[in-house]
Amino acid sequence: MNKDNTLYCSAYRIAFFSEIGIGISANSCLLLFHTFMFIRGHRPRLTDLPIGLVALIHLVMLLLAAYITEDFFMSSGGWDDITCKLFIFLHRFFRSLSVCDTCMLSVFQAIILCPQSSHLAKFKLNSPHHLSCFFIFMSIFYTSISSHILIAAIATQNLTSVNLIYITKSCSFLPMSSSMQRTFSTLLAFRNVFLIGLMGLSTCYMATLLCRHKTRSQQLQNSKLSPKATPEQRAIWTILMLMSFFLIISTFDSILTYSRTIFQGNQSLYCVQIPVAHGYAAFSPLLVLNNEKRLTSLMISMYDRIVRLESLCS
């Protein structure tokens, strides 16, 4: 039985850290791409800043997750209460930034696409300012609901204690009373329903506008659209796929979070939730890079420069 547990832990550890490695590499590439585009003086799209910001947030979040989860498999030792509170709260904080920035990206894209006759059109001129304030407010609100971590997270002193909810081998959560458990469950449900609902509405709105635009174009041309999509259409489809992927992951993660709240201390649910919770951060940049045609142009331009430098040196 111990041998089976060891094999299971080894396989799970390899799978999880493979996901983390893919996510760190992909987010680094996406962040470097946007940095190079800015340095080269290319005209940025309105969605470039939120996408670059979410890549940076995901990069830091995955690094924190790797450090915390390593303690899940093998105790790092030397973790006191302050260390536990700091790392777990920082991880939750960057997760909140990820969710809020993704929500902002979805709403921002919907405002950009809305026609002049829409009520959302009045936000177009001031949308960056308004959305920045919305991002800050939602990040504070999202993080404040998880502020109980600063009290509940403690260093694990006794591995045999049945009163603690184990997070890693060095950190645990103090159990909550039934009233506090119901309160936080309600707040978590409200938070997730609000943000996921807002992203769902903006995603459906963008999909409706895209289908309407496609139908009108077909009617004007009296034929099917060219199979080659325009940069605007590719950008819209990228955001739509990104939002759809996020909504699926968030819904699944919310179900697991609620289940863990009900069945406190269930390690199996925790093992399932860890890779699910980081799935969006790990694989979303691959989706963006795959649909980013400017990346090909940048690579060709860099290759031409390298060839020219080599020819000059020779």
Predicted feature locations:
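Transmembrane helical core of 7TM receptor-like proteins
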Residues: 1-314
